[in-house]
Structures are given as structure tokens and as C-alpha cells.
Regions:
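Cytosolic covalent-transfer regions centered on His/Cys nucleophiles
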Residues: 1-158
Length: 158
């Protein structure tokens, strides 16, 4: 039997932004992608940014309640990669509810996801952040350890 990965196993301390500097949607996307590049996870930032901008043109990934989940598949990704960023001030992101975004989950996956983890992972993130208590606790995290604790507590054991 294949063991399902818990959410926190997809995250990396190098891909955690305790306080984002971005003031606009474009700056937020750039800041999230910059972290991927600085960590050595990707080489071509422009390729990822173009893909994210195309995805945003189809409809905002600002899903409401202060959360955005920019996501997509790219040849630049050889596995699922996730960047978490928090903005205390909030960023205008053309969200479905027109509210500023405080919590960002950038999710990238390879074009061919043999393990079929991408969509289930995306679903797990959405399920987790539906809980207003989890969103509130994520908005307060100041360290990667705090972040992991909230993720772990917010998941039901399957």
C-alpha cells in the first residue's frame, strides 16, 4: 500500500516567506517565484512567471477569504514545489470576493505527474484553508516551525 504524503511533507523551509514585501498582484507573483529561484529549485524565473500570468488571465487564483493559490504545471518543475507567503498588510489580487490576500500558496508541478499528486495536493490545501480557524492561525505564524504546526494540526488523519 502506498503511503500518502502529509501536506507538510511537500513544504520546505527555504520556500517560506514570513512577511511578504509585495504591494501588488504582479509583485506578489514575482516574490513567490524569486524564492524558488533563490533556493535553487528553478533556473528560469521568466518561464514560471509567464505560466502564472497566463493562468491568472484565465481567472484569478485569489479564491477569497484572504487566500490565493497561484498554481500550474511547468517543465521547470521536476516535483511538486510549494511556496508559502504571508502578507500582514494584504495584497490586492483580484480575488473572487474582492478582499486583499494575506496567505499565498504557490504550487508548481511537472507536466507529467506520474504519482498523480498535484490535484490531490491542491485539493488538500483548499480543504485546509476552508477552515477559518486555520486561516487565522496561518495569518499569525512567524516561523516555519509555527507554520508546520498549523498544517499538522489542521489536517485530519486519513
Amino acid at each position: 500500500m502506498v503511503q500518502k504524503k502529509r501536506l507538510e511533507e511537500h513544504f520546505d523551509e527555504k520556500l517560506f516567506i514570513a512577511e511578504m514585501k509585495a504591494k501588488s498582484k504582479q509583485e506578489a507573483l514575482e516574490e513567490l517565484v524569486d524564492v524558488l529561484a533563490e533556493s535553487g529549485k528553478i533556473r528560469d524565473k521568466s518561464l514560471i512567471l509567464e505560466m502564472l500570468e497566463r493562468r491568472e488571465a484565465l481567472g484569478s487564483t485569489g479564491i477569497g477569504n484572504g487566500v490565493a493559490i497561484p498554481h500550474g504545471r511547468s517543465l521547470a518543475a521536476n516535483q511538486i514545489m510549494v511556496v508559502f507567503g504571508k502578507s500582514s498588510k494584504g495584497v490586492e489580487f483580484d480575488s473572487m470576493d474582492d478582499a486583499p490576500v494575506n496567505l499565498f500558496f504557490l504550487i508548481l508541478a511537472p507536466p507529467q505527474d506520474r504519482a498523480n499528486q498535484y490535484l490531490p495536493f491542491l485539493g488538500k490545501v483548499v480543504e485546509l484553508i476552508k477552515d477559518s480557524a486555520v486561516r487565522s492561525r496561518l495569518a499569525e505564524v512567524e516561523s516555519y516551525e509555527d507554520f508546520l504546526a498549523v498544517l499538522s494540526e489542521g489536517q485530519s488523519d486519513e
